[in-house]
């Protein structure tokens, strides 16, 4: 998170959402990135080069605060689908049905959009970076990564975005907010696809998963992670070692460990405040284990629905709000929203402050246990995952 005070630029790591937009928009190259051991980046400011123009501050998504009034009012009226690729092989190999990649490819092929900014696979850590695709540069399924459960600075390559009539932006809510700040002169119309997100992960989360598998992430970061694929909910792999994702997610995601610090100041998991037309998420609790996979799609706008209907490679099964409500995590999103002021240091109800303090204490304790002890039997991790969630108990 960047602030400009009396022409002096300052950076707060604990509120940084790791999008990389500040690095990309700086006209004087006064901002550089320094990789940390946990896979995140520190933002370094060269005061001698900084001209205090404020572009980085205006683009920073962490500086955008919302009240979230009425956020949940329209969910009962929205359209919902379980979506998946028509080809079962592709469906199985994707994170959860292959909807996101297929949206990008089909929308470019059928002319629904002229350009799309998303991610591409790379050979070195973090194994993904931002990429601009066009109707002349349509990616294959293998060009784009499956879900990546360590932080990727998705907005560092925005200079690749060329002017076009209709632009698709794909990313989490914070990434969409960052991209919104720079697209004014890039296109006539924008279609936004939000990847539902309550928490991004540091590389320490992957280190823990590797430990569970009986391997490790090498210090030089020359390894190959694959976080999803092979049906629903899929398999996590690190250099040939593997673990069912349902087990792998219990500690990092279930207990919110190794979370990017700036995630605490974002309660817009669906990207609605960023203007999302559709949101893609995993169908937890409403879909059982299967060999193929599907994505839960929440439609926010008619434009988003039209985009979906034009994707000939997708199968879309309509669902009612009552059918999908358990998977939407609305209660958990509410918890993020009410605790956001406490994470920002703003005045709020004492109960919310108490919940954040309890959450931090529990996270520190659990991290100490699982990081300091040697590899434990799976049953021990499952037991830890079932410990009462102190934050949620306070925020019943």
What are these regions (language model features)?
Residues 1-6, 49-163, 326-344, 352-358:
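Flanking helices and flexible, charged tails adjoining ferredoxin-like Fe-S electron-transfer domains
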Residues 2, 15-17, 21-42, 55-74, ...:
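Iron-sulfur cluster-binding cysteine motifs and their immediate structural context
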Residues 2-6, 10-13, 44-48, 246-254:
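Short, intrinsically disordered, charge-biased short linear motifs at domain edges
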Residues 94-99, 123, 169-179, 199-201:
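Gly/Ser/Thr-rich loops at beta-strand to alpha-helix junctions
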Residues 113-114, 213-396:
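Long, compositionally biased charged/polar accessory segments in the mid-to-C-terminal portions
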Residues 165-171, 190:
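Generic beta-sheet signal
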Residues 180-191, 210-214:
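Short, surface-exposed basic-aromatic patches at helix termini and helix-loop junctions that form
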Residues 191-212, 326:
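Short, flexible loop segments at boundaries between secondary-structure elements
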